Each structure stands twice: as structure tokens, then as C-alpha cells.
């Protein structure tokens, strides 16, 4: 009888844990679109997720939707064959992995002095 009770407790514990995980919901990110940029807003700041424009000489905006652009997410400009030069605004402080990967025509990039985090493989 003790084995059976232990098994029932184990099943109940497993069911409880499963219920906990299924009840937790992740808040979906709200994406915004402006001038070829897909971005998110959080805590009064904008993060660029991707760029689908066709500019060859691109000046990334310092403001999107009235909020300062502080981060460029991983692979945001990756595989963009049009980009030849990019100017990043002074508001950018962080760039993710492979932001400019496979941008084979990119010859120059101006980045702000305040940029304190560039992850590995930003250009590869």
C-alpha cells in the first residue's frame, strides 16, 4: 500500500508541475515598422530587430516612434547585399551577434564612441 501511495504522490506532483508550466504565459513582443525597420519598444527605448530597406548608404535613425534607438539585435542587417556604408547614431550602445553578417558589399561603417558592446561575429 505504501508503494501505491508514493506513486500517487509522484503523479500528483508531476501533474502540479506540468500545470504550473502550462499556466505561465510569455508576453509576446509588439513589433513596430517604420522606414524599412522592424523594431520593439521597451522601457522607453527602441531595439532594431531587422531592416528590409534597399538603401546602399544607410544612416540608422537615432529615434523610432519617439524613442531613442539603443540596440541593434542579432542578424538585423545580415545578408543585405545592397549595403555599402552604414552610419550608426550616437544613441546605439549595444549590437548583437552577426548584425552585418554576409553583407558582402559593406565597405564602411561609422559607429558611435558610446558603443560599449559588440558581440563576436558582428561582421561575419
Describe the residue ranges of each PLM region.
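Structural signature of tandem-repeat unit edges
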Residues: 36-44, 53-71, 81-94, 103-119, ...
